[in-house]
Design a protein with these regions (language model features):
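Alpha/beta-hydrolase active-site loop
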Residues: 1-21
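Alpha/beta-hydrolase fold nucleophile elbow
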Residues: 22-34
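Glycine-rich nucleophile elbow surrounding the catalytic serine of serine-hydrolase chemistry
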Residues: 32-42
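Conserved hydrolase catalytic core segment
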Residues: 42-51
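Active-site nucleophile loop of the alpha/beta-hydrolase fold
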Residues: 54-63
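Short beta-strand/loop motif that positions the catalytic acidic residue
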Residues: 80, 86-88
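Conserved alpha/beta-hydrolase "acid-adjacent" motif
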Residues: 93-99
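C-terminal catalytic histidine-bearing segment of alpha/beta-hydrolase fold enzymes
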Residues: 111-151
């Protein structure tokens, strides 16, 4: 995860979007879930034109067991200038990643929003995947965040 082609693919996708005539290259946000949330943070760090980044359950399943990943993602949230919205359900595998990254951004005085929603379903897996099953819970908050930071 720390050095993979996946991030290069995301960056290539962003570059492609910027070339499309109907895309305002100055108003691009990026979002991702789980591993995609990790890539979202790394892409926002690498591409300074990203205006906002939203993560759902980023690193929730690997934060405690992978110190290199923790430090890499904390480094990314330190370096990116894009406002971050970090989202978990309270019954995600772990909410520690969002809490730690939001605390780091706060310490640095950088824009961030941390949202921990009430438990979705009964299991950690259901909590982790609420991005798909409970859009009505998060969509208003995410669109307000994007309106405030990308418009």
């Amino acid at each position: 995860m720390l050095t993979t082609d996946h991030l290069d693919d995301v960056i290539a996708g962003l570059s492609f979007l910027k070339k499309l005539p109907h895309v305002d290259a100055n108003r691009i946000a990026i979002a991702g879930h789980s591993f995609g949330g990790q890539l979202t943070l790394l892409a926002a760090e690498r591409d300074s034109s990203v205006r906002a980044a939203v993560t759902f359950g980023a690193a929730a399943g690997s934060w405690e067991d992978w110190p290199e990943l923790r430090e890499r993602l904390l480094s990314a949230v330190r370096k990116t200038s894009a406002p971050l919205m970090l989202i978990h359900a309270s019954n995600d595998y772990s909410t520690a990643p969002g809490n730690a990254m939001a605390a780091e951004r706060k310490r640095m005085g950088k824009p961030r929003v941390l949202k921990i929603y009430p438990a979705i379903g009964k299991t950690s897996e259901e909590g982790h995947n609420f991005v798909y099953s409970a859009v009505d819970r998060w969509e208003t908050d995410v669109f307000k965040f994007l309106d405030a930071n990308v418009r």
